[in-house]
Curated annotation (Swiss-Prot):
Residues 366-377 have a biased composition (Basic residues). It comes from Homo sapiens (Human). May be involved in anchoring the apical junctional complex, especially tight junctions, to actin-based cytoskeletons. Residues 604-1258 form a coiled coil. The gene is CGNL1. It comes from the Eukaryota. This is Cingulin-like protein 1. Belongs to the cingulin family. Smooth muscle, spleen, testis, fetal brain, amygdala, corpus callosum, cerebellum, thalamus and subthalamic nucleus of adult brain. Residues 1263-1302 are annotated as: Tail. Residues 75-104, 186-209, 251-305, 364-392, 655-675, 903-929, 1263-1287 are annotated as: Disordered. InterPro entries: Myosin_tail. It is found in: Cell junction, Tight junction. The head region is responsible for both junction and actin filament-based distribution.
Length: 1302
């Protein structure tokens, strides 16, 4: 909902407010309870004269005229703005001091002294806790202006402040002033002092005993200066100024700002059903759980305004309201009388309107700053109605978490909790005091509704706006504790800082929810009205009717109206959407209510505050998501609308185009009908011309000569056709002979195949015998080997067995492969021969098709010539029509006819030229007449000649057709015979092929088996190769052992050498057999491919035969169609014979030239076709050759691949052997390294021994030197030498041996 309020702040316009809330028919239920003689009604008018708004409260029974207002009259006080914290240090207000305000039963009567002693004076401590000034003294009922009579002093406009320092009288002084005011009712209005910006004070309330008129000026301003950011908050309700409207709401809706009446004191424990705690929209107090809304606010500015959206979250209407429990429980609806909040009822005398106008029209005075001076004059065009923003933020601009909690908990709740007296079910009759208080509450609430609902006076009844604020304390016990302001400097500073923060928060929210953000915002529509408009009883009735509706119905209807605007959905769809949104809002409301109850129970718990903040943020996110969804739906609906409009526009365009085309078609049909009528007329004229121009026979003879020449050309063409037919027949006979030759060749090939099959069977038997003999020899050799090499059987038996199996299989596979290769070769040769013959047949058939195509071309030429003749005849007819018109009319008629001919013929340039020639020739009318006579004669002769030629052509065509039929029948018979023969041959061939296929399948099966066996053999060979590798290693070991044995068995070495040679030969044979097996595999693959190719070729031949049959059938159909066309041409020629009489010589010459040109073109086209066919054949041959080359290359590549695979295998073996050698070398290296290390160890050991020996020698040498020194006489003694030389030599000998060992 913050999005809405952010936008609501931008729509701050000033409007003049004129309300009249009088006692009308809708208040009868209230007046029933207040059935007192002194009952009164209230007439509220907010009139703006020169920028000064006033609220005038009239007594309906006695409207007294007072004194007039001066132009610079005394201003009225704003509502007092104080700092009342939601959670004080002690957490709550004592229950004893929570008594509500007790209003007098009659506002015009003086208050009783008993009540005046009940209200204690409250003052605010430094910590913001409400403290009782005198705890022992009973609370007094004195009001703020009673306790502070200095408030009644006039406002000093020059200093723009109140002098409150020298005026602090006691209660006795206030009683004196009260009695003086009661006695001397001289003042027409009460002069409330206006507080300055730095010195907020409490407003005063005039004595309620006064009667008359109270004019309250709703002007208040507070300017707050912050050292960091200068912000100004100004509250004003005006009629014809350009000032901002929401200033009072901004000022009073900030969090630290709370409007209180200074005479609202703690209530007693008495039950007061007529005074109910009320939660205002801009109050900063906590949410009253008990004060559930039973009635929505009466009106709103627009269906999308905040108050209309608040209705969505109103609580259910369940509990009945009784007079006893209204005060302290959930159903508190009446508003306490809070002076200074805009609801003050001044009972003073009401001055007349003339006096007020005279007051304002007096001396203008000086323009003063602040609120004291007269407002600046504004143009009447710029004057707008003012409107407060109190309804936008119900708790004021709060910046902390507590305000957000309260705001989220009270989203959607109505600010006006007003009950009619008829809705309250009293259990006992009310006293006069309570009735008076109820009437005061009603007038008080109506004041607020009048102040707030003036902005929507045109569209809907005014919505009540409540300025009173209620604070809930412990549990369900609710109390309205309204504090009096303190005049200390600290409270002033705090208020200024808090108001500044409030305005900043509001501005931030306004910027956050600016239209630049993508979220959808609810527009606020305001309806400005003139300054003299008033609320009529009809509007009040509408307001009451709206209040009688339930909250859910109003909310749903508002949502329905909102969703219905700008959407094309049905009513059901919009209602469903409304229900869904309403259910979601109810869930959100239930959550907010649950969170509100938890907060009321524990107001001081910060954890719950955080949870509620999180819930509030989630709710705002959900609301934003819902708004986004609404935006998307609205956008989608708009897009759908645009698409529908586009589709409609397109449909309209298409319809218009269709209508235009229909009109064009109708016009064209009319033109066609007109042209047909003209053609009929022309034909009739032609017949008349023919009858008239019978004299021109001489001219027609020339044309007959030309026609004879044409006939000669036609005869030559017929002869050429006869020759071509003969050639075709000869070619057909040759084809038949070729077919017979092919059949004979096929029979010969079949005989050859049979012979070769027999030879293959014989070869198979011989091969089998050879294989058996070879097996027997091998068995013998094996027995010899087994007998001779008993010691080596275990190592050699596996290899020999594998070799035997491979040899037997390889022999059988070789034999089978040889037989299959021979068969395949024979089949390939036969297939090649058949292919050659089939190609020859295809060529012959192609030649026949060419000839048939030539015939078709000739027939097409004849058709074209006939069509040309027909066109020329039509042209001649048109020329005759032109001639007649030229005889009758001038050259202009000729040109018109030429234009008509050009329009009829279109883009035919040749015909236009001919028409021009005809127009030039037709200028000489006399010559043309003679020519026409001659032409008539010639045309008659031409008729005869044409008839004869046509008959001849028909006969020739019949002969040709019969010949072609006979030839086709013969060909069909021959083809049938050939087909039958082919079928028989094919059946025989199929049988043979089936047999061969069976054999081939058997061979295939055998080949497959062989392949499987070969695969197994390959696997076995691989295993065998592995085994061979292992055997080779074993053989190497065995060879070493054999070599050892050979040394031992030299006598048996020769036999063993022979046997080893045989084994090597067998191994070589085995390797050769393996290679042959691989080759046989490749050959078998090739054979299978060739067989598949031969099958494909046979299928192609069959398809070609079928194509030939289809082509023959097409030719027959073409012949039939040609016959029909010939018949049609004959009929056309007969029809056109009459038209040829009116033809001319020049036309005939042109026709002949055209025919020659067309024949040349046809010949050139035929040549081009022949060249194209030759080129196509050449290309086909090249393609076949390329295919053969590709196949050969593929075969060569496969062979190369196989060879490469074998090489790779060999290389792999070599690599494996090399790796084994490398491993051996590495092992040998490791052994050598170990040996070297051992030798190094030995060397080190020996060196240590040497060193020890050297040390010993040195030690032995030292005593010998000592002994030599001891012998003085003999340097050398034999004894000494014999003693010491021997060990020295011995030691040196040891050293020498050690050195030699090293």
């Amino acid at each position: 909902m913050e999005l809405y309020f952010g936008e609501y702040q931008h729509v701050q316009q000033e409007y003049g407010v004129h309300l009249r809330l009088a006692s009308d028919d809708t208040q009868k239920s209230r007046s029933s309870q207040n059935s007192k003689a002194g009952s009164y009604g209230v007439s509220i008018r907010v009139q703006g004269i020169d920028g000064h708004p006033y609220i005038v409260l009239n007594n309906t029974e006695r409207c007294l005229a007072g004194t007039s207002f001066s132009e610079n009259g005394p201003p009225f006080p704003p509502p007092v703005i104080n700092n009342l914290p939601l959670h004080s240090s002690n957490g709550s207000v004592p229950k004893e001091n929570s008594e509500e305000l007790q209003l007098p039963e009659n506002p015009y009567a003086q208050p009783s002294p008993i009540r005046n002693l009940k209200q204690p004076l409250l003052h605010e401590g430094k910590n913001g806790v409400l403290d009782r000034k005198d705890g022992s003294v009973k609370p007094s009922h004195l009001l703020n202006f009673q306790r502070h009579p200095e408030l009644l002093q006039p406002y000093d406009p020059e200093k723009n402040e109140l002098n409150l320092q020298n005026h602090q009288p006691s209660e006795s002084n206030w009683l004196k002033t009260l009695t003086e005011e009661g006695i001397n009712n001289k003042k027409p209005w009460t002069c409330f002092p206006k507080p300055s910006n730095s010195q907020p004070t409490s407003p005063s309330l005039e004595d309620p005993a006064k009667s008359g008129v109270t004019a309250i000026r709703l002007c208040s301003s507070v300017v707050i200066e912050d050292p960091k950011k200068q912000t100004s908050v100004c509250v004003n309700v005006q009629s014809c100024t350009k000032e901002r409207v929401g200033e009072e709401a901004l000022f009073t809706s900030g969090r630290p700002l709370t409007a209180h009446s200074p005479h609202a004191h703690p209530e007693t424990k008495k039950t007061r059903p007529d005074v109910l705690p009320f939660r205002r929209q801009d109050s900063a107090g906590p949410v009253l759980d008990g004060a559930r809304s039973r009635r929505s606010s009466s009106s709103s500015t627009t269906p999308t305004s905040a108050n209309s959206l608040y209705r969505f979250l109103l609580d259910d209407q369940e509990c009945a309201i009784h007079a006893d429990n209204v005060n302290r429980h959930e159903n508190r609806r009446y508003i306490p009388f809070l002076p200074g909040t805009g609801r003050d009822i001044d009972t003073g005398s009401i001055p007349g309107v003339d006096q007020l106008i005279e007051k304002f029209d007096q001396k203008p005075g000086l323009q003063r700053r602040g609120r004291s001076g007269k407002r600046n004059r504004i143009n009447t065009d710029d004057r707008k109605r003012s409107r407060s923003v109190d309804s936008a933020f119900p708790f004021g601009l709060q910046g902390n978490s507590e305000y957000l909690i309260e705001f989220s908990r009270n989203l959607g709740k109505s600010s006006e909790h007003l009950l009619r007296p008829s809705q309250v079910c009293p259990q006992r009759p009310l006293s006069q005091e309570r009735r008076g208080k109820q009437s005061v509450g009603r007038t008080f609430a109506k004041l607020q509704g009048a102040a707030h609902g003036a902005s929507c006076a045109h569209s809907r009844p005014p919505q009540p706006n409540i300025d009173g604020k209620v604070l809930e304390t412990e549990g369900s016990q609710e109390s309205t504790v309204i504090r009096a302001p303190s005049l200390g400097a600290q409270s002033k500073k705090e208020e200024e800082v808090k108001t500044a923060t409030a305005t900043l928060m509001l501005q931030n929210r306004a910027t956050a929810t600016s239209p630049d953000s993508g979220a959808k915002k609810i527009s606020v529509k305001t309806f400005p009205s003139a300054s003299n408009t008033q609320a009529t009883p009809d509007l009040l009735k509408g307001q009451q009717e709206l209040t009688q509706q339930t909250n859910e119905e109003t909310a749903k209807q508002i949502l329905y109206n909102y969703l219905k605007e700008g959407s094309t959905d049905n009513d059901d769809a919009t209602k469903r959407k409304v229900n869904l949104v309403f259910e979601k809002i109810q869930t959100l409301k239930s959550r907010a209510a649950g969170s509100a109850q938890g907060n009321n129970q524990a107001c001081n718990s910060t954890s719950e505050v955080k949870d509620l903040l999180e819930q509030k943020s989630k709710l705002t996110i959900e609301v934003a998501e819902l708004q986004r969804q609404l935006q998307l739906e609205v956008k989608n609906q708009q897009n759908i609308k645009e698409e529908r409009e586009r589709m409609r526009a397109n449909l309209e365009e298409l319809r218009s185009q269709h209508n235009e085309k229909v009109e064009e078609n109708s016009t064209l049909q009319q033109r066609l009908e007109e042209s047909e009528g003209e053609l009929r007329k022309n034909l009739e004229e032609l017949f008349q011309v023919k009858m008239e121009r019978e004299q021109h026979q001489t001219e027609i003879r020339d044309l007959q000569d030309q026609l004879s020449e044409m006939h000669d050309e036609l005869d030559s063409a017929k002869r050429s056709e006869d020759r071509e037919k003969g050639a075709l027949i000869e070619e057909l006979l040759q084809a038949k002979q070729d077919l017979q030759d092919l059949l004979i060749a096929k029979e010969e090939q079949e005989d050859l195949l049979r012979k070769r099959e027999r030879e293959l069977t014989a070869l198979k038997g011989a091969l089998k015998e050879e294989v058996s003999s070879h097996d027997q020899e091998m068995d013998k050799l094996k027995e010899q080997y087994d007998a001779e090499l008993q010691a080596l059987r275990e190592s050699v038996e596996e290899a020999t067995k594998n070799v035997e199996v491979l040899a037997s299989r390889s022999n059988t596979s070789e034999q089978d492969q040889a037989g299959t290769e021979m068969r395949v070769k024979l089949l390939q040769e036969e297939n090649e021969k058949l292919q050659g013959r089939s190609e020859e047949l295809e060529r012959r058939v192609a030649q026949l098709q060419r000839q048939i195509e030539d015939l078709k071309g000739d027939e097409a030429k004849a058709k074209e010539t006939l069509k040309k003749y027909e066109g020329e005849i039509r042209q001649l007819e048109e020329a005759l029509v032109h001639a007649r018109k030229e005889e009758k009319e001038a050259v202009s008629a000729r040109r018109a006819l030429e234009n008509e001919l050009e329009a009829a013929q279109g883009n035919l340039s040749q015909t236009t030229q001919e028409q021009k020639q005809l127009s030039e020739k037709l200028k000489e009318e006399s010559e043309q007449k003679e020519q026409l006579r001659r032409l008539k004669n010639e045309m008659e002769n031409e008729r005869w000649h044409l008839g004869k030629t046509i008959e001849k052509l028909q006969k020739e065509m019949a002969d040709i057709v019969e010949a072609s039929r006979t030839s086709t029948l013969e060909l069909q018979n021959q083809l049938d015979e050939y087909k039958e023969k082919n079928r028989r041959e094919l059946a025989e061939m199929q049988r043979q092929l089936k047999e061969k296929t069976l054999e081939a399948e058997k061979s295939r099966l055998t080949a497959m088996k062989m392949q499987d066996e070969m695969r197994l053999m390959e696997e076995e060979l691989r295993d065998y190769q592995r085994a061979q590798d292992e055997a080779l290693t074993k053989r190497q070991l065995l060879e070493q052992t054999l070599k050892d044995l050979e040394y031992e068995l030299e006598a048996k070495s020769h036999l063993k050498d022979d046997r080893s040679r045989l084994v090597k030969q067998m191994e070589d044979k085995v390797s050769q057999l393996e290679m042959e097996l691989e080759e046989e595999r490749n050959n078998s693959d090739l054979l299978s491919e060739r067989i598949s190719r031969s099958r494909e070729q046979m299928e192609q031949l069959r398809n070609e035969l079928l194509q030939e049959r289809a082509a023959r059938q097409d030719l027959e159909c073409d012949k039939i169609s040609l016959e029909r066309q010939n018949k049609d041409l004959k009929s056309r020629i007969i029809h056109l014979e009459g038209s040829y009489r009116s033809s001319k010589e020049g036309l005939v010459v042109q026709m002949e030239a055209r025919i020659a040109e067309l024949e040349d073109r046809l010949e050139s086209e035929e040549r081009d076709r022949a060249n194209l066919q030759l080129s196509n054949r050449r290309l086909e041959r090249k393609v076949k050759e390329l295919v053969m080359q590709v196949d050969d290359e593929h075969l060569s590549l496969t062979d190369q691949k196989d060879q490469l695979s074998l090489r790779l295998k060999a290389m792999k073996r070599q690599v494996e052997e090399a790796e084994e050698e490398i491993d051996r070398l590495e092992s040998s290296k490791k052994k050598l390294q170990r040996e070297l290390e051992e030798q190094m160890d030995m060397n080190e050991h020996l060196q240590g021994q040497l060193n020890s020996m050297k040390k010993d020698l040195r030690l032995k040498k030292l005593p010998s030197k000592v002994l030599d020194d001891m012998d003085d006489d003999d340097d050398l003694s034999t004894d000494g030498g014999s003693l010491y030389e021997a060990p020295v030599s011995y030691t040196f000998s040891k050293d020498s041996t050690v050195a030699s060992q090293i």
